[in-house]
C-alpha cells in the first residue's frame, strides 16, 4: 500500500491484520520535507514556538535554548512514557504505527522523513513496540501510549519481534537500523495524536460489522427454530419507517429465510404475534447498523486528519496552536458503539430465553433430552446473562468524565482511549453471547422436522460440522469455543451469505 493522503478502514485492516506492506508516496515525502523546512527556519530564528523551543503543557511559557532543543524532545519522550497495564495487542500497536505515519505524512507536523520511514519499517518488519494499555486521557491525544511507541524509535523500551519481547536497541540493531536522534518538534509530533483511540476504534468497527451480520443470522435461525413469523421483516412493513439500518436488516433476514419450509408449515397456527426480540429485529439491529455507519463516517475523517499541535502550514510559514489532538469525536463515537454493540448482545440473550424456556415455546426445557437427568443449555443462558450484565456497566459513557491535567492547562479531556478499550470488551462479550444463541438455535432446529430458509440451513449444517447435536449432557465449553471461532472468523456468516 502507498501511504499518501487517504486511508480507508479496509486498507487499515489489510495492513494491520494481513500485514500488507506500506511505503511512503513521493508526494507525501515532499509534503513532509516542506513542513520540516518551516521548523528549521524557526530553530534558526528568534520566534518562540510552542513545542519547538518552549516547554510543554504548563511549561509552555518557558523558553528553551537552541543547544538544548534535541534534549527537550528526548526528555519529552522518556518522561511521558509512563503508562501502565497489560501490553496492547500487536494488532492495536500496528494500527498505531500506521495511523501515526499517516498523520505525519499529511505534512503539517514538521518531523523529518526519517521519522516516518522508521515507523513504517517497524510496521513492515512486524517489530511492535511494547505499549501499556493504560495511561491515556484522550487529550492531548494519547500521550503516554504514543510516548511508549516513540521510545522504541530512539532505542529505549521494548519491542516484540519474532514472538519475543526484547530491548528496543537490540531489535533495531538486528534489523540494521540506528535509533533516531530526535530533533526539534519531532518528539511532540510523535505523541500528539489520537492513534490509540483510532486504532482500537477501527479494529472494533470492522469486527462489529461482522458481528452484526452474524447476529442477523442468529436471529433468523431463532425465528425458524421457534416457528416465528416472517411478516414483520417484509419490505412493506419496514418501508413505513425506513431507517436505513432497519431496511438493510430486514433485507438480510429475508435472504437468510428465503425458501423456508418451516414458515408454511405453521401458517395456520393460532399465534398472533411474536415477542419483541424476534419481531423487532430490524428495528433493534438496524439501529446498531446506523450507529456503525456513523462511526465509519467519523473514522473516514479521522484517517485523513492531522491531530498534532502546533500545526505547520508550509504555504504561509505559519505555526498555529489548536485543538486537533482532542479525542472527543472518537470518544463520543466509541461510547455510542458501546451501547449499540451491547444492545446486540442484550436482545440476543433474550432470544436465548425464548429458545430455552419451555413456557415460551413448544421446545423441551433448556433443549435437553430427558430434562432433569440432563440440564441441557441451562447454564449457557447464565453465561449469556452474566456477559450482558457486565456489558451494562462497561457501556457507561467514558466521555462524560473529564479530569483536568497539567496543572489545569489541559482542563478538559475526552477519555476516548478508555471508552475504546471498553468497546473491545463489550464486543468480545457480544461475540460470545451471539455464539450461545447460535448454539441454542441449532439445537432447537434439530426438533423442527422441516428445512429452514436457505441461509439458515447452510449455517445450521456448518455449525453441525463443528458442534454435534446434544444427545446427553457433555462438556459444552469446547463446543462454544469452536462455534465462537466460526463467528469471529466470519466463516459462518460467509457460508450463510453465499448460500
UniProtKB/Swiss-Prot annotation:
Molecular-function annotations in GO: histidine ammonia-lyase activity
Compartment(s) where it occurs, according to its Swiss-Prot or TrEMBL record: Cytoplasm
Reaction(s) catalysed by this chain's protein: L-histidine = trans-urocanate + NH4(+)
Cross-linked residues, 5-imidazolinone (Ala-Gly): 139-141
GO CC annotations, alphabetized: cytoplasm
Pfam family, one: Lyase_aromatic
Superkingdom to which the source organism belongs: Bacteria
Sorted UniProt keywords: Cytoplasm, Histidine metabolism, Lyase
Keyword Lyase: yes
Database matches in InterPro entries: Aromatic_Lyase (IPR001106), Fumarase/histidase_N (IPR024083), HutH (IPR005921), L-Aspartase-like (IPR008948), Phe/His_NH3-lyase_AS (IPR022313)
Enzyme class at the top of the EC tree: lyase
Modified residues (2,3-didehydroalanine (Ser)): 140
GO biological process: L-histidine catabolic process to glutamate and formamide; L-histidine catabolic process to glutamate and formate
PTM note: Contains an active site 4-methylidene-imidazol-5-one (MIO), which is formed autocatalytically by cyclization and dehydration of residues Ala-Ser-Gly.
Pathway(s) where this gene product acts: Amino-acid degradation; L-histidine degradation into L-glutamate; N-formimidoyl-L-glutamate from L-histidine: step 1/3
HAMAP family, sorted: His_ammonia_lyase (MF_00229)
Family: Belongs to the PAL/histidase family.
Protein name: Histidine ammonia-lyase
Originating species: Deinococcus deserti (strain DSM 17065 / CIP 109153 / LMG 22923 / VCD115)
Lineage: Bacteria, Thermotogati, Deinococcota, Deinococci, Deinococcales
